[in-house]
Amino acid sequence: MASGNSLRVQQQADFARTLCHLILWAQQQGMTITLGEVERPPILAELYASMRKGIKDSQHLDRLAADLRLYLSGVYQEDTPAYARLGEQWKKLDKRARWGGDFPKPDGNHFEFIDEERV
């Protein structure tokens, strides 16, 4: 395995562990969380970009992003503000953590790691 691949695997492991911490924290707060999309194939990223529903270089391509599904009192939350507590907690967990609710076009259920060079 090349060193670049080893680094990517370590980043993916760090992301997965940090995501677990967020989900456990959310459960302690009385939230119900399920997983949405984590890995996105390149062809799907290109399709989403052409439809203006995503970007071609999404962190999902490297398994460094997850779309979470938040349920409060059994009701799925679709609006970004419902995810604000999760987003704030996520950003506290790791310097690489970025929340989609902070994007110019907010994507509240999106949680990702950015490359360490960009931190």
Locations of the language-model features?
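Catalytic cores and adjacent binding grooves of peptidoglycan-active enzymes
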Residues: 55-119
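Generic alpha-helical secondary structure signal
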Residues: 13, 17, 81-84
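Second-shell loop/turn segments in exported
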Residues: 4-13, 72-79
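Intrinsically disordered, low-complexity
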Residues: 1-6, 24
